[in-house]
Amino acid sequence: MKQRLKQLYMETIVPKLMEKFKYKNIHQVPRIKKIVINRGIGEASQSNKILESSFKELNLIAGQKGVITRSKKAIATFKLRKNVPVGVTVTLRGERMYGFLDRMINLALPRIRDFQGINPKSFDKFGSYSLGLEEQLMFPEMEYDKIDQICGMDISIVTTSTKIEEGLILLKEFGLPFKN
C-alpha cells in the first residue's frame, strides 16, 4: 500500500520544489532519507522493567522493532559502567517512515496541550530537523492505563537537502506545523 505522504511528495512536492529552486534534475530535489526515534533512559541501568516498557512503547509507536543502545565507556560521575543499556533507538525508512510521519503530523502533534507549532530553528546546517517530545501519550497507539512511566523521545528527520531553507520548505510542504 502506497503511503499518502509518499504520493503527496511525488505528485505535488517534487514539482513545487523543482520550480522554486530551479532544479534541472528530479534527483536534486531534497527528500526525507530516514526518521530516527531515540529515547534515552538514564534509570535503565538500575531497573530492567523501565527499559523493557520503553522498548515495547517505542516499538508500538514506530511500528518496527528498535535497538537497545548501550554505553560505550564507563563514566564514574554518572555511575555508569561500560556496555550498560542507556536507551532505545528506532530508525525508520521507506513506507514505515512515511506512515509514522503522517501519524505524527495529523494525529500526535495536534494532541499536545497548548500546541503552538514546532520551532523552525531546530535544523542542523545540512537541513535535517530534530524535535523533542515530552510524553508518549500523544500517539494514538499509547493507552494511558498501560504506561508505567511518562517519558519523552527525540525525533530526527534526516533529509538530503544541503541548505536549511530547502529542508524547511520540504518539511512545510509535508505539513509539519512550524511556528511563524
From Swiss-Prot:
Q: Which GO terms describe its cellular component?
A: chloroplast; ribonucleoprotein complex; ribosome
**Keywords from the UniProt entry:** Chloroplast, Plastid, Ribonucleoprotein, Ribosomal protein, RNA-binding, rRNA-binding
Q: Where in the cell is it found?
A: Plastid, Chloroplast
PROSITE patterns xref list: RIBOSOMAL_L5
SUPFAM superfamilies (UniProt xref): RL5-like (SSF55282)
Keyword Nucleotide-binding recorded: no
List, in alphabetical order, the Gene Ontology terms for molecular function in this entry: rRNA binding; structural constituent of ribosome
Q: Name one GO biological process term.
A: translation
Q: Which residues form a coiled coil?
A: none
The family note in this entry says: Belongs to the universal ribosomal protein uL5 family.
According to its UniProt entry, the function of this protein is described as: Binds 5S rRNA, forms part of the central protuberance of the 50S subunit.
Q: Tell me, how does this one assemble?
A: Part of the 50S ribosomal subunit; contacts the 5S rRNA.
Name used for this protein in its record: Large ribosomal subunit protein uL5c
Native source organism of the sequence: Oedogonium cardiacum
Name of the gene encoding the protein in the UniProt record: rpl5
